[in-house]
Each structure stands twice: as structure tokens, then as C-alpha cells.
Amino acid sequence: MAWSITNKADTSSFTKMAEIRAHLRNSAENKDKNDDIFPEDVIIPSTKPKTKRATTPRKPAATKRSTKKDKEKEEVEEEEVVIEEYHQTTEENSPPPSSSPGVGNIVESVTAVELDDSNGDDDNDNDNDDNEPMVQVEAGKVNHSARSDLSDLKVATDNIVKDLKKIITRISAVSTVLEDVQAAGISRQFTSMTKSITTLSDLVTEGKSKVVRKKVKTCKK
């Protein structure tokens, strides 16, 4: 898009403003896009490379499948273990079972019901399934009461042991203080006794106590 205006003598130059305007209009309409120094349509690629974030694979959540039979077996095993522990603790720390028939009768009734349910006929399976929740509830109550009794007894014994330890530490502290006081008193009595013995020996040997004359220092003028 180069053009110039020359003198009027030159016939090849533009002589009218209309011709100049027409020439500028044609040049503006027919100009090439590559002639622009800063074209608008050119996309400048970015120099920074695109980085993809590393995706950590997610672990599938483990699904636990528990059947009704497995749950019932686990509950029965837990009940048997608790009943055995309760029998051991009652035999060691409580009077004979004749003095406390209530708990023994309940435990025996629960075990008898469980045995009856386990030895039932095939025709009465549905009835046994209906009665099992009631038996489990009763056994759970007995187990809960036994556990609560054992926990209360343990808490009481722990408190008694702590109190006894505190009393022992206080008694030992008092005994050490008394020993120190007695030792100090004995040492004082011993020193006073030695002084009296020395004065007695002086009186026996010389008949009177020694008189020590102190020399008086005179100041020289």
C-alpha cells in the first residue's frame, strides 16, 4: 500500500481529492491481513507446557456381607463366654449358689431354652425363629447385669487400693520426720552430757574449775 503525490506537471499523479479517497478506500478493502504489524486474528501459543495432575486411584469400599445365621452364631458364642466368666467370678468371690438362687435360675432357664431351641423339630423352625429374639433379649439382660456387677466391684477395689497407698505414703513421711527429730534431740543430749562429764572430771582432779586468764592487749602509743 504505497502511493505518493507528485507535481501537477506529472500526468500519472492524482489531481483530485476524490481520486485519493477512492484509492485509499480500494487499498483498505483489498489489503492483505499479513501486512498488519500486530494482526488481531493471529493466536500466539503459550510457552508454558500444560501439566496434568496425577490422579490417585480410589480404593473400592469394602462391603461386609453378614448373614442372619452368622450373627446368631456370634451372639450365642458371646453369651456362652460371658456366662462362663460369670460362673467363675461368682464361684471365687461370692457365697454358694443356694444363697443367691435368682441369677442361677435365670442362667439355667436361658441355657435350657437355648438347648430346646437347638434340638427342635424341622416342622417348628418358624416358631423357633420367632422365639429366638426373646431368648436373646433375656440373655442380654443377664449378661449386662453380670458385667455391671463385675465393673462396680472392680471400681470399688481400685478405689480402696488407691486410698491404702495414700495412707502408706503419709505414714512413711511421718515416720521419717519423727526419726529426724529424735536424732537431733539425741545429738543435743549427747553434747550436753559430754560437757557435764568434762566439768565433773575437772572438779575431781583439781578440786575446782580451771580459771583461764585472758591476756589484755595494750595499745602502743
UniProtKB/Swiss-Prot annotation:
Taxonomic superkingdom: Viruses
Segments of this protein annotated with the region Disordered: 25-105
Predominant place of localization: virion
Pfam families: Pox_Ag35
Post-translational events: Phosphorylated at multiple sites. Phosphorylation is necessary for cleavage activity. Phosphorylated by the viral B1R and F10 kinases.
InterPro entries in UniProt: Pox_Ag35 (IPR004966)
Listed Basic residues bias regions: 49-68
Inducing or repressing factors: Constitutively expressed in abundance during viral replication.
Compositional bias (Basic and acidic residues): 25-36
A GO CC annotation given for this chain: viral envelope
Cellular localization per UniProt: Virion; Host cytoplasm
Residues bearing PTM Phosphothreonine: 89-90
Keywords assigned: Elongation factor, Host cytoplasm, Phosphoprotein, Protein biosynthesis, Transcription, Transcription regulation, Virion
Keyword Protein biosynthesis tagged: yes
Summary of subunit composition and partner proteins: Interacts with the DNA polymerase processivity factor A20. Interacts with B1R kinase. Interacts with the late transcription factors VLTF-1 and VLTF-3. Interacts with the late transcription elongation factor G2. Interacts with itself. Might be part of a transcription complex composed at least of G2, A18, and H5.
Similarity comment: family membership: Belongs to the orthopoxvirus OPG110 family.
Function: Involved in the co-transcriptional or post-transcriptional endoribonucleolytic cleavage that generates sequence-homogeneous 3' ends during late transcription. Involved in postreplicative transcription elongation on intermediate and late genes. Also involved in DNA replication and in multiple steps of virion morphogenesis. Required both for inclusion of virosoplasm into crescents as well as for maturation of immature virions (IV) into mature virions (MV).
Protein name (Swiss-Prot/TrEMBL): Late transcription elongation factor OPG110
Native source species: Variola virus (isolate Human/India/Ind3/1967)
Name of encoding gene: OPG110
